[in-house]
């Protein structure tokens, strides 16, 4: 679910950037999404949005699905055997790892999406 996703983000980036920094970034980080991603980090969000879309097609509710994960010393891992929990955790885990390895550009935070996301 979205709360667990927030924790996975913190785990993957070892607390270097608070999760809320990703809630209004570029064209895809946060609610909705359109146009061309502005950078690598925004592409992570587009991929995550698409992953959630696939989860919904499978009959899952990704924003609400609770799953099991472990925040280890190397990186977070998912601990779910089957179904929606496994799929949604994988979506969130891949996005969190993608966020951690992608540069954050302050100029792409809280942009005018009506102009830059066509």
Swiss-Prot record:
Cofactor: Ca(2+)
Subcellular location: Secreted
Free-text cofactor note: Binds 1 Ca(2+) ion.
Gene Ontology process terms (BP): arachidonate secretion; lipid catabolic process; phospholipid metabolic process
PROSITE patterns: PA2_ASP, PA2_HIS
Gene3D superfamilies tied to this protein: Phospholipase A2 domain
Domain of life: Eukaryota
Covalent S-S links between cysteines: 11-71, 27-117, 29-45, 44-98, 51-91, 60-84, 78-89
Enzyme Commission identifier(s): 3.1.1.4
Keyword Lipid metabolism: yes
Tissue: Expressed by the venom gland.
Pfam families associated with the record: Phospholip_A2_1
Top enzyme category: hydrolase
Molecular function as annotated in GO: calcium ion binding; calcium-dependent phospholipase A2 activity; phospholipid binding
Catalytic residues as annotated in Swiss-Prot or TrEMBL: 48, 92
Keywords: Calcium, Disulfide bond, Hydrolase, Lipid degradation, Lipid metabolism, Metal-binding, Secreted
Catalytic reaction annotation: a 1,2-diacyl-sn-glycero-3-phosphocholine + H2O = a 1-acyl-sn-glycero-3-phosphocholine + a fatty acid + H(+)
Main localization of the protein described in the UniProt heading: secreted
Binding-site list for Ca(2+): 28, 30, 32, 49
Any single Gene Ontology cellular-component annotation: extracellular region
InterPro entries the record matches: PLipase_A2 (IPR001211), PLipase_A2_Asp_AS (IPR033112), PLipase_A2_dom (IPR016090), PLipase_A2_dom_sf (IPR036444), PLipase_A2_His_AS (IPR033113)
Family: Belongs to the phospholipase A2 family. Group I subfamily. D49 sub-subfamily.
Subunit structure: Monomer.
Function description: PLA2 catalyzes the calcium-dependent hydrolysis of the 2-acyl groups in 3-sn-phosphoglycerides.
Protein's UniProt name: Basic phospholipase A2 4
């Amino acid at each position: 679910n979205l709360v667990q996703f927030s924790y996975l983000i913190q785990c993957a980036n070892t607390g270097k950037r608070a999760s809320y920094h990703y809630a209004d970034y570029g064209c895809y980080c946060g609610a909705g999404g359109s146009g061309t991603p502005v950078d690598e980090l925004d592409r992570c969000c587009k991929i995550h949005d698409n992953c959630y879309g696939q989860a919904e097609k499978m009959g899952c509710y990704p924003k609400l699905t609770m799953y099991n994960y472990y925040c280890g010393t190397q990186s977070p891992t998912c601990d779910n055997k089957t179904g929606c929990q496994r799929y949604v955790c994988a979506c969130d885990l891949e996005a969190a790892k993608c966020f951690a390895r992608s540069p954050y550009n302050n100029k792409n935070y809280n942009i005018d999406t009506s102009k830059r996301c066509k």
